Amino acid sequence: MQDMKVNTASFMQLYAWYSWPNVILCFFGGFLIDRVFGVRLGTIIFGLFVFIGQIIVAVGAFTDAYWLMELGRFVFGIGGESLAVAQNTYAVNWFKGKELNLVFGLQLSMARLGSTVNMNVMGILYNKVAQTYGSGHSCLGISLMIASVTCLFSLACALILGFLDKRAEKILHKEQGKTGEVVRLTDVKDFPASLWMVFMVCVGYYVAVFPFIGLGKVFFEEKFGFSAPSAGAVNSIVYVISAPASPVLGFMVDRVGKNILWVLVAVLATLGAHVMLAFTFWNPWIPMSLMGVAYSLLACALWPMVSFIVPEHQLGTAYGFMQSIQNLGLAVIAIAAGSILDSSGYLFLELFFCICLCFALIATVLLYLIDLIRDGGLNLSSRERDKKRELDAAEARRAELRRRESQRDLTRLGPRSAFALRNRYLCRLGAQLPAHYSLQLSSLACRSLLK
C-alpha cells in the first residue's frame, strides 16, 4: 500500500477484482471444459490466463499504474477458479472411491501450502530486491515479476499433464475427462430451503476469514507490535494448520458424520477467535491456531452436504451457485472491510467480522431445524447415513421396477401396426392364421372358432 500510495479500500479492490469474474464463471467453468476446450486444452488456457494476469499485475506495479494491477487481478481471476475446476476434473478422471477423498485432501493441502509460502517468502524476497533497487513501486514490480515464475511453473505442469493424459488415453483407451456438471439455471427454483441455508453459512463464514487474512499482517504489527516477518508468520498459521489438518479432519467427518454439528462447532470456534483478537491482548497464536482448525473443519463438513441435499443431476448447478454467491460475498465484503478499516480502525472491523459470523451461526441453527423437521439426514451419524442410503437405494429400485411394469402395461395397450390390426380383424371373423404370427392372435383365433 505504501509503495503504490493507496489506502486500504483501494488495496482490497485487488481481492474484489479476483472475485468479480468468478461470480459468473463459476457457472460456466465446467461447461467450457466439457463442451468447448476439453480438460487438457482448458487446463492450459486457464493456466495461461493466470500467468498473464500475474505478469500484468507486476507490470502495473513496476510502472506505478494501479489500474493496470486491477486489470491483472481481473485476468488472474478469470483463470484461477476455472483452473481449479480443471484440476478437479483430472482428479475425478484418474482416481476413484476412497482414493479420491485422499486426492482432494492433498489438493487442498497443497493449495494452503502455497498460500503459506507466499505469505512468508514474499516479504523476504521484497527486502532482498530492495537492497539492490531500493524500496518503492519498482521494487514491488520486480518482486511480483519474480513471483510469476510459480505461475509459469503451473503452466508447464499443465502442458506436461496434458501430454501424459493424451498418452494414457491412447494406451488405456480412456475417454478425455469431463466435469460431469450440467448447469441449468432453471434448477435454482427447485433448491430446497436447507440448501439456501448452506449457501448463507458459506458466505457468512468465508467473508470473515479471507478478507481478515488479507488485512491481518498489518493488524498484528499495529496491535501486538510484531515485526513484519513475525506478523506474516502468525497471519499464515491458518493455512499452515489447514494443510495437514484437512485430510485428517475430512477422514474424521466421513467416519463420524454429524455434519451440521461440526459446522456449528467450526462457526463458534471462529467467532471465539475473532472475539479474542478484538477484545483481548492474548498471544494471537492461540486464536489464529483455533481459526485454522475451525477453517479446515468447516470445509470438510459444509461442502459435502450439498451432495446430500440435491440430486446428482443438479450438483453442477448447486456447487456453481454456491461458489458464485461466495465470490460475490467476498468481492463486496473485501471492499466494505477496507472502507471500515480506513474510517473506523481494526476494532470495528473485527466487530464487523463477528456480525458476519453471527449471521453464519443463525443460518446453521436454521439449517439444523429445517433438516430436523423434514428428516433430511444432514446431521445423521455415518452409520445412520449408510443405512438411510441403503433404504433409499432399495426404494429407488422398487420405484424403477414399478415404472418398468407400468411401461410394459402401456406398451400392450398401445396402438398396433396396420398388419397387426388386419390380423386381429381376421381373427374376429374366424379366419385361421399361422401360429407363428402371434401367440396372442392365435389364441384369439381359437377362441373365435369355439363360439
Report each predicted region and the residues it spans.
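Helix-to-loop junctions at the C-terminal end of transmembrane segments
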Residues: 24-38, 245-258, 341-342
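Conserved MFS/SLC helix-loop-helix module at the cytosolic interface between two early adjacent transmembrane helices
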Residues: 24-66
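Cytoplasmic membrane-interface "Motif A"-like loop-to-helix N-cap segments
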Residues: 35-47, 254-267
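Cytoplasmic helix-loop-helix junction between adjacent transmembrane helices
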Residues: 72-110
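Glycine-rich segments within core transmembrane alpha-helices of 12-TM secondary carriers
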Residues: 101-127, 325-333
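Symmetry-related core transmembrane helices of the 12-TM Major Facilitator Superfamily/SLC fold
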Residues: 141-160, 350-367
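Extracytoplasmic gate region of multi-pass secondary transporters
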Residues: 192-243
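C-terminal transmembrane helical hairpin of 12-TM major facilitator-type secondary transporters
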Residues: 257-305
